[in-house]
């Protein structure tokens, strides 16, 4: 089992919130290994690199553009958590241009895979008519 897979499993086993962020920050020494695996197409490593740039453990500061780059690669490889995180970033315009249409697209991909948080977020966009045509039934 490679480091990215082991760390991904450990990360996902933690409760959401500060424990996950602390884990990513404490594993910054593994970033070169993640980069090697991500470059070879490992979706879990791409997600972890995205997360590291998202929370600021990759070089000390958060880097939204790098986070989006790695989340997008992980998302395109089918990682639903990366798909959801892209939706969050685009919906909030955190460090990049806000784009609710793009947020809805990524939420939809993760929602279609059964991720409850993405289903809720997509439902909120439908309800408010942001990024999608308003549809209270959908």
How would you describe each model-predicted region?
Residues 1, 39-42, 55-57, 76-79, ...:
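Short helix-capping/linker turns of helical repeat alpha-solenoids
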Residues 1-52:
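N-terminal segments that cap or nucleate solenoid repeat domains
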Residues 3-4, 10-11, 30, 50, ...:
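Small-residue hotspots
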Residues 35-37, 73-74, 109-110:
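Canonical positions in the second alpha-helix
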């Amino acid at each position: 089992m490679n480091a990215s897979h082991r760390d991904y499993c450990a990360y996902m086993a933690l409760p959401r919130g500060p424990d996950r962020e602390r884990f990513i920050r404490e594993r910054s020494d593994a970033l070169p290994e993640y980069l090697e695996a991500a470059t070879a197409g490992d979706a879990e490593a791409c997600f972890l690199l995205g997360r590291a740039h998202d929370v600021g453990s990759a070089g000390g500061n958060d880097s939204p553009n790098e986070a989006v780059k790695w989340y997008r690669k992980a998302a395109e490889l089918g990682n639903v958590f990366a798909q959801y995180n892209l939706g969050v970033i685009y919906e909030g315009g955190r460090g990049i241009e806000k784009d609710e249409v793009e947020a809805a697209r990524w939420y939809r991909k993760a929602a279609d895979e059964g991720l409850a948080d993405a289903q809720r977020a997509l439902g909120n966009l439908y309800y408010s008519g942001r990024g999608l045509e308003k549809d209270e039934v959908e």
